[in-house]
Amino acid sequence: MHLFNKIIILSVSVSGLIAQSLPTETSTLFSGSGSCAVCHTQAGPNTAALQDSHGKDVSQTTYWRSTMMANAAIDPLWRAKVQAEIASNPHLQSVIEDKCTSCHAPMGNTQAGYDGQSDYTIAEMLENPLAMDGVSCAVCHQIQDQDLGEGESFSGHFTIDDSRLIYGPFSNPVVGPMVSMVNYTPTMSPHISSSEICATCHTLFTPYVNDAGEVAGEAPEQVPYLEWLNSDYPELGIECQTCHMPAIEENIILSNRPQWLGSRNPLHTHEFVGGNVFMLKMLRNFGDELGVRASEAHFDSTIDRSMRLLERQSVRLNLSAVWNSMADSLTIEVGVENLSGHKFPTAYPSRRAWLELKVEDQSGNIVFHSGAWDATGEIVGLDPGYEPHHQTITQQDQVQIYQNIPRDVNSDKTYTLLRIAGYLKDNRIPPAGYLSDGLAADSTRIEGLATQDPDFNRNGLEEGTGGDKVHYSVSGLSPDASYYISATMNYQTIAPRFAQDLFDYDLPEVEVFQSYYEQMDLSPIPIASVEQTISTSGIKAHTPESQLMVQVYPNPFNPETNIQVSLPEDGNIKLSIFDLQGKQMIEIQRINQSRGMQEYSWDGKDSQGLNLEAGIYVVQIEFRATGSPIASRANSKIVYLK
C-alpha cells in the first residue's frame, strides 16, 4: 500500500464553471499536478515568470488542465466504452481494465504495478486521486529512455522507476528547489522532446477475440506514431511535439520560484492540441457533473487552439471545374492534401472526415449535393453497411468519407474494440511520403477500394503524395446558367453509427454519456473549404472562375523560399506568416494586383528583420477581388530549416 500526502491546495475561480483544486497527493513514484502547479503556474512570488513578451500566461498547468490528457480518466466516452467492452467480454474484465488504465490513469496503474499488483481496476481508479489526475506531469516527465520507438514500449509499456528523475529539455537545470519541494531531481534528456515518448501510448495494439471469446491475436487500434514513421516528417526533424506542443521562441522564466531563476528558450507549450473538439466541449458543458479541474475559460482556450490546428494544419483543398457543352454537365475535381504528419483523420476509429460538394444555380437552388448531413450529424444517403471509397462520384448519395471501418475475425463490421481483427476499409489520407512498403506498413495499411485508386496517395507511378483527388460528374444542367460550386471537408470525432452501437448497451456509464451526447451540437466541424463559380456561356461570373492557390518552394527551405500566389482575378492581397501559436510574424499587403501568378520571397525573418527560429510556420493568403467585400483564403505550411 502506498501513502498519499497532502501538500497544498490550488484552485482557480472564474465565472461559470469553476476550476477545482488540482490533486497534491503523493506516492512512492508520483506527485499530483497540484504539487507541480505551485511553481509552474503564473503567480507569485515571481509574477514575471511564465508569461510571453505580450504578458500572456503560458504556464504549463494553465494550458494542460483543460486538455484531453488531463481529463483522460474523466472522459465520459472512454468510461462508457470500457464498460461496454467488459459487458461484451466479461471474462476479460481484468485485462480490459488494466490495459485501458495504463494510459488513461497511468499514475494509479503504474504505482499498482510497482507495488506488485498484477491488474489495476476501474474501481481502484475512481478512489485514487492520482489516477484521476489523468496523463499528469509526473508521468511523461519520468518516462525513461528505454525501448522507446520499439514494440516493447508501445501500448502503455513505458518504463518508470523509483529514481524520481524528472526529465526535461534543458541542460544544467536548477536542482535544489524541486528536490526540496517535491523530492524530484530535474535532469536534461533529449528523449523528452522525441516522438518516441508519445508513441508509448499513441501506438496501441489491442487483443481481439474469436467467436468463442478466446484471444486470437492483436490488431492496431491506433498507430499515429507508425504513420508518422512512414512519412517525410522524421527526416525533416518534425516531431509530434512540433505541432501538438508548439514552441514559443522567446526567453521565458519557467518557474515562479526561486525569484532569481533565469529564462529559457524555447518553451514548448503544454496545450496538447488534437482533433477532439467535440469531447472538449462536452467536458466544458458538463464539467460540474464530471468533476473537471479546469474552468470554462480554460476549456474555451484549448478548444480555440484545437480549432486552429484543425483549420490550419490538417488538410488543404483545391477545386477545378470544366463545363461539358456536349452533355450539359460539369466535371469537377476536388484535390485533398494532408498537411499533418500522420493519417487524416488518425487515431481512434470513431473518427471520420468527408467531402461535402454542393452545386447551386444562379438562383441559389441546389442542383447537386453530395455529403449533406442531418440534425443527428449523420450523412445523407450513407450506404447501409459502410460507404466504400470513391474515385468518381456521379450520384448525390455517393460521398467520399475518409475513415477506417473495423472488421472481426469473420470480416464482419464491428465497433467492439476486442473484436477488431483488422479493417474492411482504411482510406484515411496518409501523410506525405507514405509508402505501401515503407516502415511499419503492415500496421498502417490502406484497405479497400482506395488501394485501386490511381489518385489516392499517388500521382501516376509516384507514390507518397499524401493526397487524394475525387472526380464528380454532375449532369442534367442548364446550358444557360452559372453554377456556384463549393467543397468542404467536414470532420467528426464520433460517427453516429459508432455512438448508436454504444447506446445499445444498458449500462450506467453509457446512459451518462448518452445523456450528454444528446444535448450536444452534433454538427460536423468544417475544417477546410474551397469554392468556384463557373459560367456555361464562357462569360466570367461574379465570383472567380479559378481558385486562389498558394505554392511554396523550396519547402523545407534555408535561407529563402518563394511564395507563389495564383490570383483568380484582379484584387487586393494580404500575405501573413504565423507561428504554430498563431502569433503573426510578418504581414505583406498589396493592392491592385493583377490576375494570375504573383510571387513573394521570405527569408525567415519577422517584421522587425530578426531571424526566426527553425520550425513550422503557416502562410495565410487573404484575397478580395476588386469591388467585392468577400474574402477568400488559402493556407500553406512552411518548414524553416537551420
Range-by-range predicted roles:
Residues 475-480, 607-609:
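Short, surface-exposed loop/turn segments at beta-strand-coil junctions that are enriched for proline
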Residues 540-553, 557-579, 587-591, 599-601, ...:
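Glycine-centered coil/turn sites that cap beta-strands in beta-rich domains
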Residues 45-85, 117-464, 470-477, 485-535:
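Primarily the internal scaffold of c-type cytochrome electron-transfer domains
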Residues 468-472, 596-600:
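Short strand-edge motifs at loop-to-beta-strand transitions and within beta-strands
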Residues 20-52:
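N-terminal module-boundary/linker segments of secreted carbohydrate-active enzymes
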Residues 2-10:
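Sec-dependent signal peptide recognition
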Residues 481, 594-598, 613-616:
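A glycine-anchored, Pro-Gly-centered beta-turn/N-cap motif
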Residues 601, 610-642:
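C-terminal tail/sorting-segment detector
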